[in-house]
Amino acid sequence: MNNLFPFLALDKIALQLGPLAIHWYAIFIVGGAALAVWLACKEAPKRNIKVDDIIDFVLFAFPLGIVGARLYYVIFQWSYYSQHPSQIIAIWDGGGAIYGSLIAGAIVLFVFSYYRMIHPLDLLDITIPGVFLAQAMGRWGNFVNQEAYGKIVSNLDWLPPFIRNQMFIEGHYRMPTFLFESIGTLSGFILVMVFRHRIKGLKRGDIFSSYLVWYGAVRFIVEGMRTDSLMLGPARVSQWLSVLLVILGIILFVYRRIKKN
């Protein structure tokens, strides 16, 4: 219990409406997605993309992104879920992987772009600022669920009490790696929003490539601090994927500059 700020004492459930429990995790995920859609709808006309196309894309991408995030997590935690199959669908308790959501979202985006005859890089550039913001918000869902934390530390006196108390896990204070990633992705969002219309010579796909490099670097660093990483043998899966993102981002950025129009 937080004695200084009792109203900030955290529970996974934000609101109980009879048998319906509304979890903080869901609020942060849905809230981040809603802001991402709003941002994309504001930008779409500048790329000659219909707002209806953005809405239709989200109606496919959001639920499948949640499925992808959960499926990715379950696959790499199969030793547990094979023994507790009823927990596979318990997404309200947390246990989703951003990379799974990104993979599912990317598949939906390319298929959707093909059928709607929209250049995929245009759709990516439009949606990336919102993705940054949604990821920054989503990490606070992990915070409430006491996920995405780091190694044991002696104290967290530099943090506000409500964060410090929530980072007291299994009898020890834990490094708030969720916070580091949230700040990193929020910084990426701010940079993109400030500079995307101010830098001359930006090419189609540059915002997307900047996301790949920025988020890949942020996630690689933060993942190295975590103690609850998804593993494949001795390897941290997310760090390998982060390296891949950075490489792909650099390749795309260079390719767009050497490609003849």
UniProtKB/Swiss-Prot annotation:
A GO molecular-function annotation: phosphatidylglycerol-prolipoprotein diacylglyceryl transferase activity
Annotated GO CC locations: plasma membrane
EC code: 2.5.1.145
HAMAP family: Lgt
Subcellular location: Cell membrane
One of the protein's GO biological processes: lipoprotein biosynthetic process
Highest taxon in the source lineage: Bacteria
This protein's record includes keyword Cell membrane: yes
Key words of the record: Cell membrane, Membrane, Transferase, Transmembrane, Transmembrane helix
Metal-binding listed as a keyword: no
Membrane-spanning ranges: 20-40, 54-74, 88-108, 175-195, 235-255
Membrane topology listed for this record: Multi-pass membrane protein
PANTHER family, per database record: PHOSPHATIDYLGLYCEROL--PROLIPOPROTEIN DIACYLGLYCERYL TRANSFERASE, PROLIPOPROTEIN DIACYLGLYCERYL TRANSFERASE
Function: Catalyzes the transfer of the diacylglyceryl group from phosphatidylglycerol to the sulfhydryl group of the N-terminal cysteine of a prolipoprotein, the first step in the formation of mature lipoproteins.
One matching Pfam family: LGT
Name of this chain's protein: Phosphatidylglycerol--prolipoprotein diacylglyceryl transferase
Pathway where this protein functions: Protein modification; lipoprotein biosynthesis (diacylglyceryl transfer)
Family matches, as InterPro entries: Lgt
Family under the similarity heading: Belongs to the Lgt family.
UniProt binding sites for a 1,2-diacyl-sn-glycero-3-phospho-(1'-sn-glycerol): 139
